[in-house]
Amino acid sequence: MKIFIQNQQDKVDIDQHISKIIEESIVNTIKVFLEEENFEISVLIVDNSFIKELNRNYRNVNKETDVLSFPIFEFKNGKLLEDIVIMEDEIPLGDIVISIEKAAQQAKEFGHSLEREIAYLTVHSVLHLLGFDHIEEDDRKVMREYEEQILQSMGLTR
């Protein structure tokens, strides 16, 4: 599995520990649903102003958010809905954009560590790449159960 992490902000220091948490969160989420490991995910770490612009451009929502997911293939609850033929070694699942600035604010607000917040946002975003959503209450419950299960498997609880 290839995971690309790029930091495009200077508001919050990003160290190897944060990058490792992002990688572990991706791997632990993917392995719940997919048997193969030949996937690629890109993660972009940004500030609030950058993610606000993306949110406005792609979702028509003119405010900052904590994380955005851009899936390449159509999944529904962890199952691929289309046949794909990829000529490369790695199958690109999509892109994740995390506002580390927003994550730091939320960690403080919720009374837990930045590491726990980053792990949660990463798991949440990968679940979106895999076709989970939280628009309907039943779907939200399923997604929350997976989030908690994966975070607990990583030793990160509320």
From Swiss-Prot:
Q: Name one GO biological process term.
A: rRNA processing
The disulfide bonds in this chain are none
The coenzyme or cofactor needed here is: Zn(2+)
Q: Name one GO cellular component term.
A: cytoplasm
Q: Which GO terms describe its molecular function?
A: metalloendopeptidase activity; RNA endonuclease activity; zinc ion binding
Enzyme Commission number, as recorded: 3.1.-.-
Pfam families named among the record's database cross-references:
YbeY
Give the cofactor binding note. Binds 1 zinc ion.
**Cross-referenced InterPro entries:** MetalPrtase_cat_dom_sf_prd, YbeY, YbeY_CS
Residues that bind Zn(2+): H124, H128, H134
| Primary localization | cytoplasm
Q: Where in the cell is it found?
A: Cytoplasm
Question: Keywords on this record?
Answer: Cytoplasm, Endonuclease, Hydrolase, Metal-binding, Nuclease, Ribosome biogenesis, rRNA processing, Zinc
Quote the SUPFAM superfamilies the UniProt record gives: Metalloproteases ('zincins'), catalytic domain (SSF55486)
Q: Does the keyword Metal-binding apply?
A: yes
Where do the TM regions start and end? none
HAMAP family in alphabetical order: Endoribonucl_YbeY
The similarity comment for this entry is: Belongs to the endoribonuclease YbeY family.
What this chain does, per the entry, is described as:
Single strand-specific metallo-endoribonuclease involved in late-stage 70S ribosome quality control and in maturation of the 3' terminus of the 16S rRNA.
Record's protein name: Endoribonuclease YbeY
Species name for this entry? Caldicellulosiruptor bescii (strain ATCC BAA-1888 / DSM 6725 / KCTC 15123 / Z-1320)
Q: What is the lineage of its organism?
A: Bacteria, Bacillati, Bacillota, Bacillota incertae sedis, Caldicellulosiruptorales
Name of the encoding gene: ybeY
